[in-house]
């Protein structure tokens, strides 16, 4: 059975890595080693010396192969759309590119699956060493992987998983780097149980874009975590990851006098919108709000009492690991089929130990 590498985002490690990687400003292009000037013909080395130098050069070449020295690989990074999260992800990508001396070419699909497929095919025609893919949706991701296989170009997936496996493992991928969305959804359920205790209550679920892997699997994990508890989801609606839409959803529920004591959101944008609506209605003390993601606004909202808890993982670390894993594969090193980056709980007691990245 193949192993899954799990990386818990420990408080100190996540914060230090976020600060360190975000501050890297090196170029993503490879730097060529200076050329060695040949000795004049009249100063030919002795035979024994030449042999020794040749042996030494061969050993150094072998060492370079095993230690993964910088090589000028070209990696296409395909992003699904513009969000603050992917700005932070790119910080990690760029830092790793500078560290490993590879060239990165970006493409943003603007949340259009057909556009992303066309972008991927363009890179296949131009020629790249590897495609690092954060797909718009799983279906389009599968098409890209199939097309890339036909073009003999390896694909690594990150952030958004492809296929139905909860772990993110998918045949045809070099590897998947990111969170297990089912586990992530379960964390929000555990936060809800911690906040409400044994009394439980009635929950509103505000979801992301319908049909996306995060929306489907986060809901699945939440429902699994709430099994056997006294917390019942009585209403769910999509906000499409948008703060204003979540605010409107909660305002409408308040006007309808629906009774609930917790709002569980699949992202921090929605949570801050829900919390704002409750605060403006004078109901925040009676209703708990839970977010997901650990954004700057989300962490600040926990500090300000607008929301009561969220989750955290490092987007910078995720971007760095995507390129690090890609380079290892291109260098012929063994990589695991999945590298999981875990979300951890954030509450008012520990929020000051986390640093928002996006």
What residue ranges belong to the model's regions?
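A residue-level marker of the well-folded mature domains of exported/periplasmic proteins
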Residues: 2-5, 17, 24-358
């Amino acid at each position: 059975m193949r192993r899954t590498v799990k990386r818990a985002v420990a408080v100190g490690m996540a914060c230090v890595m976020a600060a360190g990687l975000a501050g890297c400003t090196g170029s993503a292009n490879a730097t060529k080693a200076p050329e060695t000037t040949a000795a004049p013909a009249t100063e030919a080395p002795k035979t024994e010396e030449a042999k020794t130098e040749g042996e030494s050069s061969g050993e150094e070449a072998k060492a370079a192969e095993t230690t993964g020295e910088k090589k000028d690989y070209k990696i296409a990074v395909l992003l699904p759309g513009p969000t603050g999260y992917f700005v932070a992800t790119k910080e990690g990508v760029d830092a790793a590119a500078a560290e490993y001396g590879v060239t990165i070419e970006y493409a943003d699909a603007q949340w259009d699956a057909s556009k992303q497929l066309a972008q991927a095919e363009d890179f296949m025609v131009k020629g790249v060493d590897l495609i690092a893919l954060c797909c718009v949706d799983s279906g389009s991701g599968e098409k890209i992987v199939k097309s890339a296989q036909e073009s003999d170009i390896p694909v690594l997936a990150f952030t958004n998983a492809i296929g139905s496996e909860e772990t993110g493992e998918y045949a045809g991928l070099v590897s998947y780097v990111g969170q297990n969305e089912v586990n992530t959804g379960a964390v929000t359920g555990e936060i809800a149980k911690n906040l409400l205790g044994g009394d439980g209550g009635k929950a509103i679920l505000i979801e992301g874009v319908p049909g996306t892997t995060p929306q489907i699997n986060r809901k699945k994990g939440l429902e699994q975590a709430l099994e056997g508890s006294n917390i019942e989801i009585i209403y769910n609606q999509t906000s499409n990851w948008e703060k204003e839409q979540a605010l409107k959803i909660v305002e409408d529920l308040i006007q309808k006098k629906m009774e609930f004591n917790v709002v569980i959101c699949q992202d921090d944008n929605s949570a801050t919108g829900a919390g704002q609506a409750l605060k403006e209605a004078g109901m925040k003390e009676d209703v708990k709000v839970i977010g997901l993601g650990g954004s700057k606004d989300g962490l600040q909202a926990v500090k300000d009492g607008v929301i009561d808890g969220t989750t955290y993982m490092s987007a910078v670390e995720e971007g760095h690991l995507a390129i690090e894993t890609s380079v290892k594969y291109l260098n012929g090193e063994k990589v695991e089929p999945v590298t999981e980056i875990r979300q951890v709980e954030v509450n008012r007691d520990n929020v000051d130990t986390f640093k928002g990245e996006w």
